C-alpha cells in the first residue's frame, strides 16, 4: 500500500467523520432535548407519546400524510402521461411544459397564496374547507422537483422506439405506458414521489397562511408551549425523510446496476431517434 | 411455405412541413415475397414502412393488406411484426418475456405464450439465452430476439427497418442471411428497408430503389443490376464509371467498342455511358493511350484506376491475381465488355 492511497483513505475517513458529526449532531441534540424532563430533570418519553396522544397533533400528522399521498398520486397521474405524450407526440411543447413546471420555483409562497386565494374560494365552495384541498397547490409546488426526476428517467430510455415496438406488438396506449414505459422509468417515478413527499411534509408557509392545521403548522404552534413535543415531531419528520431516501436508494440500486451493464453494451451507431424519418 | 398476404401501397404521399417525404409511392408486394426498399437517407423508404406499420399517417393515398384497407387502422390493430433500427427490446423483461409480449397483448394464456416464445427462440438459435435481459446480450443477439418477437405474433407482414445498420460488418452478414432463411421458412410477406445495396440485393426477391419520395425502379436484384431504368438507379446500385459515348441506332460507341444501349438511354447523340467496373477491361499495351493511375487491393478482387487520353478516370474491377501485373504509370488499353449500358445526357 503506498503513501498516497493511505493519505487518501485518511482524508476520506476524516471527511466522513466531519460530515457525519455535522449532520448527526443536530439530530442527536434534538433527540436529547425531546427526551428531557424540563420540570423534574431526568429523561421522559412524554414528548414522543404526545405525537399520538395529542389529538390536534395526531390529526395534523394524518392530514400531512394524506396530503403527501394525494399529492404524489395526482402529480404522477398528471405529469407522467403528459411528459410521455409531449416526448412522443408534441416535442415542440417540451420547452413550454418545462418552463411551466419549473415556474413555481421562482414564485414565493406568499405570492402563490395571494394568487390562489380567489381560486380557493371556488375550491372551498365545491369541496369544502378541508385541509386536503391543499393537494392542488402542493401538486403545483412539487412540479419542479418531480419534473426533473421524471425527465431524467425518460431521457435514459429510447422512449420512441420502445413505445413503437409495444404498439406494433398489439399494445394500446394504456398498455404501452403501463407495461413498457412505467417499468422502465420506475426509479424516476420513485424519486419524484419521495421528493414530493419530502416537500409536502416540509411545507409551512402556504398551509399556515391558508389557515390549515398541517403537521408543520402544528409543530410551530406546539413549539410555543411545549418545546420537547415540537422538537420530537420535527425529528420524526426528519427521520421519516431519511428513511424515504434510504428506501429510494435501496429500490433503485438494482436498476442502477442494470444501467451499468447497459452502458457496457455498444449502442446503435446510426439509430434514428428523432426528426423526419428517411 | 407461404403464409403471407399481399400488400398494396397506393399513391402514398407524406408531407412534413415543406418536405415531401413520399411523393405518390405505389408498391405491390406479392404474398410471401420479400421486397427491399433501397435508397439514400431522406428518400422516403422509412416513411413508407412506418405508414405501412401504422406508426405514421399518410397525407394522402391508401394502405391495403390482404385486400383489407388499413389506412385508418391504428398500429396496434394491424397485426404487423416490426424490427427496428435501434435496439428495441424491453429492458425490464427477459428475452423469453420480450418474445411473448405480443402474445400477452393478444390475451394468450401463459402456457401458449411461453411455448410459442421458445419455438421462436429456437428458430433464431437463442434458446440458451431465454432468461437473460437485453443488457446481457450483444447487438446481434438483441436484433435476433427482436426478430423472434416480431414473428411470434404470426404477423401478416414483417417489417424490417434497417435492422442491421447498428451491427458490425461480420454480424451484419450473418444476421442478413439468417433473416432470409427465417423469412423463407415462415413465408411471411416482408418489407425490408435499407440503405445498403449489398444487403438489399442479397436478401430480397425484388428491390425497389427510391429517390426523393419516388420509386425509381422495382425489379429482381439481377435485373436491377444489369438493366437500371434510370441514371439514379445505375449510380446508386453498384459503382459506376461515367464514360463519354455516342449513341446511334440503339448502339453506344465507347472505349473503342460498340455495345447495346439500354432502354432509358438517350436516343442519339453524345452522352455519358454508365459502365460497371466489372465490365471494363484493361490490357497492358506499350502503345496504349491510357495509363494506370492506381491499384486498390480489396482481397480477392482489386480495382485498377486508369486515366484515358481525354482525362476521364475509369475504374476496372478484376481478380487480384490479374491486377498484380499493373503498376501506376503503366500504359494500357481500356475497353468495355459487350453488355448493355445506360447512356444519359452529358449534363445528367
Predicted regions mapped to residue ranges:
Chain B
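Pre-Walker A (P-loop) beta-loop-beta motif of ABC nucleotide-binding domains
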Residues: 25-36
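ABC ATPase nucleotide-binding domains
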Residues: 34, 75-232
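The feature captures the beta-strand-to-loop junction immediately N-terminal to the Walker
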Residues: 38-40
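Helix-to-loop junction immediately C-terminal to a conserved catalytic motif
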Residues: 53
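Conserved ABC transporter NBD signature motif
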Residues: 61-69
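ATPase nucleotide-binding modules
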Residues: 229-273, 277-293, 305-325
